[in-house]
């Protein structure tokens, strides 16, 4: 009897390891390479897009912004990513079933930019979840991409004028933030993704005639391509929290934008992204994984061909497997925000090669 009591006491005294927000969730022992870990969407091969879109629309605040969850304080980065999702699904500030939601998101971002007119000034107060993980400038970087994509789809008028002016200011802020090595951020948990979004913002701005410095884009490309070490044939991870997926996604996205998909970093990225362990990134699905899939899917779509077909099928199966019962996606580590992860996944699912229609 005494021995039994002592055994129970010892068992209770043994600490149980906890999985923090920074540590990956355990992988099931029967997990096979090439197949995502099963989840609520087990058995599905294509994600539901209608329910996550409805959730995202419902989660939008009265002021037009999105926070990490429904009915939470909004931030510019999450709002911009959610706005891009609406645009990609055909809901612009002036057309589409959910045009009013898109316009409210646009005006939320425009007002935030207008409140911070100095070129070096951040447009969002410090302390948001995207900032902590991707760096202080992520709001500006994503705002530029959202504004650039929105302006392209808007008719002439006051809204477009304000959006264009806000975009020009974001471009100034982004170029002021660029460092000597071509990066745009060294703070946050995985700043390489922030630099990838900064470059995306500049390209989106350039596409609609904003004043973007060619040297700034050249430096950004050089920085991202140097993230691949051709001698060791690996991706450097100093700016990607030790996760090669983030660096590879950034490099591949940049190569697609710059037209250098045949160069070594892009070729290596495509090869690595065919490996299940590599695609798992940190080991569980945080917002960083979701945006890495988004960046990679953009690049594969630009290239087209068999690589696109294989990647598209695999990423859609993966997102179907980890989709939650209510249709949303949520991060397992770091960027855990339902709004952020759901928006990123909707963008991924909306991406198609040129001249291929979007399907819902």
Regions found by a protein language model. Name each.
Residues 3-15:
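Bacterial N-terminal signal peptides
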Residues 18-360:
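Preference for long, amphipathic alpha-helical scaffolds in soluble/luminal domains
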